């Protein structure tokens, strides 16, 4: 029951005895020492020769190596100077590169670089007559386009003038209507002012004149 349902210890999937250990045996101790640097050689190197000749050859070899490093044997492409951006660090930089100009008299002609000229195909070159015809066609097209543009400009100008005339007429009509409305408003305002100013006239009546005409026909009292 313990092996199939996930309980108990897991069983080993490989044979330990095949590795060289038996069950219950201790593993060997871990070695913490570094390995030897170089294995023992059967043939030992010959000791270097010392003396004035060897020292002279060594100094000569070193001097030759340094001179070869300084010579411009490696031709580099010229750097393009960018004058747009001036950097502060470039002001004090010293250029140690030397321009190498070889003496071509001592070198073969095959080593001399040559500029390659691009040769065009004869088929691709147009003839003079075809070039003239294309130039005439282009000039005629240019004249046509200029005439069309002039016509368009004249049409636009006439349209603008008509629009300006119509706009001026509409403005005149609006001004006349505004003048009539202003006149009507002034008349109306005058009538209102007259009605409002009626209180200036005196309408007071004390009643003395009441019945003056009727006294002539009335009979006086007799005593």
Swiss-Prot record:
GO annotation, cellular component aspect: cytoplasm; nucleus; RNA polymerase III complex
Subcellular location: Nucleus; Cytoplasm
Transcription regulation in keyword set: no
Key words, A-Z: Antiviral defense, Cytoplasm, Immunity, Innate immunity, Nucleus, Phosphoprotein, Transcription
Biased composition (Acidic residues): 173-198, 206-223
Segments crossing the lipid bilayer: none
Tissue expression as described in the entry: Expressed at low levels in the liver.
Gene Ontology MF: a single term: chromatin binding
GO process terms (BP): cell population proliferation; defense response to virus; epithelial cell proliferation; innate immune response; positive regulation of innate immune response; positive regulation of interferon-beta production; transcription by RNA polymerase III
Pfam families registered for this protein in UniProt: RNA_pol_3_Rpc31 (PF11705)
Stretches the record annotates as Disordered: 111-223
Protein family: Belongs to the eukaryotic RPC7 RNA polymerase subunit family.
Job description of the protein: DNA-dependent RNA polymerase catalyzes the transcription of DNA into RNA using the four ribonucleoside triphosphates as substrates. Specific peripheric component of RNA polymerase III (Pol III) which synthesizes small non-coding RNAs including 5S rRNA, snRNAs, tRNAs and miRNAs from at least 500 distinct genomic loci. Acts as a long tether that bridges POLR3C/RPC3-POLR3F/RPC6-POLR3G/RPC7 heterotrimer and the mobile stalk of Pol III, coordinating the dynamics of Pol III stalk and clamp modules during the transition from apo to elongation state.
Quaternary organization: Component of the RNA polymerase III complex consisting of 17 subunits: a ten-subunit horseshoe-shaped catalytic core composed of POLR3A/RPC1, POLR3B/RPC2, POLR1C/RPAC1, POLR1D/RPAC2, POLR3K/RPC10, POLR2E/RPABC1, POLR2F/RPABC2, POLR2H/RPABC3, POLR2K/RPABC4 and POLR2L/RPABC5; a mobile stalk composed of two subunits POLR3H/RPC8 and CRCP/RPC9, protruding from the core and functioning primarily in transcription initiation; and additional subunits homologous to general transcription factors of the RNA polymerase II machinery, POLR3C/RPC3-POLR3F/RPC6-POLR3G/RPC7 heterotrimer required for transcription initiation and POLR3D/RPC4-POLR3E/RPC5 heterodimer involved in both transcription initiation and termination.
Record protein name field: DNA-directed RNA polymerase III subunit RPC7
Biological source species: Mus musculus
Gene: Polr3g
């Amino acid at each position: 029951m313990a092996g199939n349902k996930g309980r108990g210890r897991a069983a080993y999937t490989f044979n330990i005895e095949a590795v060289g250990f038996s069950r219950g045996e201790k593993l060997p101790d871990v070695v913490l020492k570094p390995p030897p640097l170089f294995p023992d050689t059967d043939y030992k190197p010959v000791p270097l020769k010392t003396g004035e000749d060897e020292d002279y050859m060594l100094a000569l070899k070193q001097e030759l190596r340094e001179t070869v490093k300084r010579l411009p044997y490696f031709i580099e492409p010229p750097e393009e100077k960018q004058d747009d951006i001036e950097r502060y660090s470039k002001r004090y930089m010293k250029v140690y590169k030397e321009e190498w100009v070889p003496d071509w008299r001592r070198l073969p002609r095959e080593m001399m670089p040559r500029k390659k000229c691009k040769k065009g195909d004869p088929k691709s070159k147009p003839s003079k007559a075809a070039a003239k015809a294309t130039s005439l066609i282009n000039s005629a097209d240019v004249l046509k386009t200029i005439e069309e543009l002039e016509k368009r400009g004249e049409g636009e100008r006439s349209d603008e003038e008509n629009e300006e005339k119509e706009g001026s007429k509409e403005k005149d009509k609006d001004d006349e209507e505004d003048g009539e409305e202003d006149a009507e408003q002034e008349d109306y305002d005058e009538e209102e002012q007259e009605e409002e100013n009626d209180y200036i006239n005196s309408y007071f009546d004390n009643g003395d004149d009441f019945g003056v005409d009727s006294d002539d026909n009335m009979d006086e009292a007799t005593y």
